[in-house]
Amino acid sequence: GDQIHLGAKVFMFTEYKILAPVVLVLVIACGFSPLGWYTAMAIAVGALSSAIAGFIGMYSATQANVRTATAAENSGAESALSISFFGGSIMGLCVASMGLVGLGGLYFYFTGAMDDPDKIAKALEGFGVGASAVALFSRVGGGIYTKSADVGADLVGKIEAGIPED
């Protein structure tokens, strides 16, 4: 379990190191566009919120994996299902919480900085752009990471252990 957790953590840090310059270019390009710096700030906050939610979700899921396997072995399927359900619900609650805190904080800030409700709404749209950019990269990168781990496990099973193809 520790190896899975460590591998997932290394993947997340590597992914975010690659993603940070992409988000930075997006923020700077938006800042110099007619959309303005308020929208650029919302993009940055949305990207940060999504990245934090993704990291917390990955951390909790890898921790829940070990606990679920242990519970299945020692206590049976009911206990394992309960642990896996609550371990997975952390991600959903974290995404909703980060969205509410991020959008709420931006709305509070923008209503004090701007008078026009249309400009506030346009600026808040940047939050979704930033969050979606990180989610897209995480989805695609995570799929590639998962497939490469699957292929590696298949090769080890066939070559090292002599396990036939399933």
List each model region and its residues:
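Hydrophobic, small-residue-rich transmembrane alpha-helices and their short perimembrane loops
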Residues: 1-166
